[in-house]
């Protein structure tokens, strides 16, 4: 999958830096859903290369159903694992409203991967997975 990244960087005298990204790419979850996600992300990397990342995303799945989420991470620059939170949801994703889920992200040349993995009940799974046929 192709990912578009537009970024801006401020570098401080101690080599720490503040970066912003405007990304669009492909996402998938552990219920069989997938689609396109647009994210606005900021990260601060201190002089010890420790990272604090915050972002907000708008996602459309393969059936044009939407949700919005926040991202937080304190790991690698171009890849890492963090926490996402569903902050607004539509239709079948309403069952995830307010839920926090781990995610993994990896930017690679010419593409990217964003994977959500939520722990949910059987009832929630039936709601989220039943419309994927």
Predicted regions and their residues:
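Beta-strand-enriched cores of mature, soluble protein domains
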Residues: 1-133
């Amino acid at each position: 999958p192709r990912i578009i990244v537009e970024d801006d960087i401020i570098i401080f005298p101690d080599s720490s830096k503040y970066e912003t990204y405007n990304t669009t790419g492909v996402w998938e979850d552990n219920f069989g859903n997938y689609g396109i996600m647009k994210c606005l992300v900021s990260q601060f990397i201190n002089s010890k290369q420790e990272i604090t990342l915050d972002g907000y995303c708008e996602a459309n799945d393969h059936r044009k159903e939407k949700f919005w989420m926040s991202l937080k991470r304190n790991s690698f620059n171009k890849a890492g694992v963090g926490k996402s939170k569903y902050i607004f949801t539509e239709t079948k994703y309403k069952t995830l409203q307010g839920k926090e889920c781990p995610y993994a992200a990896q930017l690679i040349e010419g593409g990217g991967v964003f994977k959500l993995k939520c722990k949910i009940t059987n009832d929630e799974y039936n709601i989220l997975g039943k419309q994927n046929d």
